[in-house]
Curated annotation (Swiss-Prot):
Catalytic reactions of this protein: Release of an N-terminal dipeptide, Xaa-Yaa-|-, preferentially when Yaa is Ala or Pro. Substrates are oligopeptides, preferentially tripeptides
GO annotation (BP), single: lysosomal protein catabolic process
Gene name of this polypeptide: Dpp7
Tissue: Predominantly expressed in kidney, but also expressed in a variety of tissues.
Source organism phylogeny: Eukaryota, Metazoa, Chordata, Craniata, Vertebrata
Record localization: Lysosome; Cytoplasmic vesicle; Secreted
Protein name: Dipeptidyl peptidase 2
Function: Plays an important role in the degradation of some oligopeptides.
Record keywords, A-Z: Aminopeptidase, Cytoplasmic vesicle, Glycoprotein, Hydrolase, Lysosome, Protease, Secreted, Serine protease, Signal, Zymogen
Signal peptide: 1-33
Amino acid sequence: MGLHPCSPVDHGVPSWVLVLLLTLGLCSLQATADSVLDPDFRENYFEQYMDHFNFESFSNKTFGQRFLVSDKFWKMGEGPIFFYTGNEGDIWSLANNSGFIVELAAQQEALLVFAEHRYYGKSLPFGVQSTQRGYTQLLTVEQALADFAVLLQALRHNLGVQDAPTIAFGGSYGGMLSAYMRMKYPHLVAGALAASAPVIAVAGLGNPDQFFRDVTADFYGQSPKCAQAVRDAFQQIKDLFLQGAYDTISQNFGTCQSLSSPKDLTQLFGFARNAFTVLAMMDYPYPTNFLGPLPANPVKVGCERLLSEGQRIMGLRALAGLVYNSSGMEPCFDIYQMYQSCADPTGCGTGSNARAWDYQACTEINLTFDSNNVTDMFPEIPFSDELRQQYCLDTWGVWPRPDWLQTSFWGGDLKAASNIIFSNGDLDPWAGGGIQRNLSTSIIAVTIQGGAHHLDLRASNSEDPPSVVEVRKLEATLIREWVAAARLKQPAEAQWPGPK
């Protein structure tokens, strides 16, 4: 196993490792002197097995798994390893939105590693074909976890720190993976911070109405009038459609194409509903650019836009523009290009990463969420197990296994695990699908008041609610304790006492 583009030198140590070792002395001094916490990540590729669990089909074939590494704050031989378990996206985007981990590395003198998930970003087992039908068979949670485990072992071996305590970090699906790493590979990972990790929902154990009910609650909490206006806008669109006033809908909402079929209406409803999902998840108290550029407090801004228009459908258009037309340069909404329906009703996005996530939502990740216009403010859009199964057969030729995560990763019964923090924000619609109470003295659940999707993983900001400041302090304390405990558990070197 090696790394690209660097090649091993004569003694078998990859050249990137030599660079890392040569710079350690300087970096250890800078860790306390630098006032700006830029981790100076370096991008590398690791030769990863394509298939960890089959010795025949792919033999020893490998692909390049991308990872980012920073030793800027690391005290070699004493500092831990902070290992981010990448999720459904480009690893640079995830690293750039996880500043708390960098801050914590500076405090605790840790080596930083951000590992990209197979089939996402540039970690493509079959190149550009990877997310096409017929090439996705190696995209599983288990394969991704094995990637992380093999990479971590190789890093520790190459750096000569086989006993360095490692803490896994992740947010959302990545938070699930960080918890799973602690559960499946406890000899490698001493603890995990699983931020906004919906481990219950994805195992098929949640309420299918919960997600969009909680999105609605965010907007109702901002303004009951806003939530009612959303209901009114969707009802007006439906009424106009039933009257055959397709051009009126297109003109008022601003679609590039006129609606002409029930399929178009469902697509429009999904397109608009997705905008609310994004705003609720990204409801941070300062401007961000994670899923796209958004202003501070986007739920509040969205409601203001909606209510500022006298015509409700035009108000809905103004709100959707926060997500789909942040530049203000789009003349209209291409509802089929900007939003693609998939096996995740909360949205897959577009492009290669979206196709990979759609496949995962068709196999192991169970996301059968409905909106019903009773417990939520959205049009009735069902997504049952039966509808999911048919979609996945048609799209990928696969049968979902709705109960598999309960079997493989315990569902919500995690009492036998240890050293995992499950953090959730009370504004995050994913929180209801996660662990929200302590399961033991070391399976800890914390709630961030005024917190959106994995707010605690983001860099400190002067606009942060007081709750997230306190939660980060708790997380830092627990992680420091886990690292110290892992050090104490390391076996002492055997001493040969000599002949009696």
